[in-house]
């Protein structure tokens, strides 16, 4: 087996922050629901700056699908201006057993 490239099913972790009208519009609830549908783990929470922040972990294709959702979809009443992603990296194991809302 080649050590070059990524192993099939490689796990990925990424932090995110979503800007726009994302508080008071059930954004966290919909984020949690979408994460469970996709089978990714992590967390989501509101910030005092009016943004939503969190972390997503899982198979690379599922994390990429969640990144797309956090950038383009959101909750029905939200308005996403931009989403910043940081600390994107490959991981050897998941740090969470599910997806939760933090307060």
Swiss-Prot record:
<comment type="function">
    <text>Its physiological role is not yet clear.</text>
</comment>
<dbReference type="InterPro" id="IPR017968">
    <property type="entry name" value="Acylphosphatase_CS"/>
</dbReference>
<keyword id="KW-0378">Hydrolase</keyword>
<feature type="modified residue" description="N-acetylserine">
    <location>
        <position position="2"/>
    </location>
</feature>
<dbReference type="Pfam" id="PF00708">
    <property type="entry name" value="Acylphosphatase"/>
</dbReference>
<feature type="active site">
    <location>
        <position position="46"/>
    </location>
</feature>
<feature type="active site">
    <location>
        <position position="28"/>
    </location>
</feature>
<dbReference type="InterPro" id="IPR036046">
    <property type="entry name" value="Acylphosphatase-like_dom_sf"/>
</dbReference>
<dbReference type="InterPro" id="IPR001792">
    <property type="entry name" value="Acylphosphatase-like_dom"/>
</dbReference>
<keyword id="KW-0007">Acetylation</keyword>
<dbReference type="GO" id="GO:0003998">
    <property type="term" value="F:acylphosphatase activity"/>
</dbReference>
<dbReference type="InterPro" id="IPR020456">
    <property type="entry name" value="Acylphosphatase"/>
</dbReference>
<feature type="domain" description="Acylphosphatase-like">
    <location>
        <begin position="13"/>
        <end position="103"/>
    </location>
</feature>
<protein>
    <recommendedName>
        <fullName>Acylphosphatase-2</fullName>
        <ecNumber>3.6.1.7</ecNumber>
    </recommendedName>
</protein>
<comment type="similarity">
    <text>Belongs to the acylphosphatase family.</text>
</comment>
């Amino acid at each position: 087996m080649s050590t070059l490239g990524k192993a099939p099913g490689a796990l990925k972790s990424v932090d995110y922050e979503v800007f726009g009208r994302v508080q008071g519009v059930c954004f966290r609830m919909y984020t949690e629901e979408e994460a469970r549908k996709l089978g990714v783990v992590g967390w989501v929470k509101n910030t005092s700056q009016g943004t939503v922040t969190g972390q997503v972990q899982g198979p690379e294709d599922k994390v990429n699908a969640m990144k797309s959702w956090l950038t383009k979809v959101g909750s029905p009443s939200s308005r996403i201006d931009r989403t910043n992603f940081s600390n994107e990296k490959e991981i050897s194991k998941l740090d969470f057993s599910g997806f939760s809302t933090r307060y």
